[in-house]
Amino acid sequence: PCESFLKSELEDGTLLSKLTAEKVDFVVLAGFLLKIPDEMLTVFPDKIVNIHPSLLPKYGGKGMYGMKVHEAVVAAGEKESGITIHIIDDHYDEGSVVFQTTVPVLPTDTPEDVAHKVHELEYKYFPQVIDEMISKL
């Protein structure tokens, strides 16, 4: 199932109650910007996965998302960027890396160009990696 929720439901435990009531085994986040509460991490150890639009640990952490990441990659003159699919832990973008792949960043690339390349990686690999992870449950 796919569930929408309010930030307050994440913070007050309502979401966790819903997930456990539905007997959810695995949680998939996509560019999720909020910190997951410790209690939820305890109930779902190594079973909450997220995707980040850079090659972590570069360009990760609180406040690094979307175009901010791609702008930083271009500003730093990076030769490559990519995606990281990782397990959520109690720190922003520091969980165990499940999968990474890269794309070249050309000297002529704009942040929008990099974003397009990274989105293509996300569309291709995120569903595949999720399927592989679920098959191992």
Give each language-model segment a name.
Residues 1-137:
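One-carbon transfer enzymes
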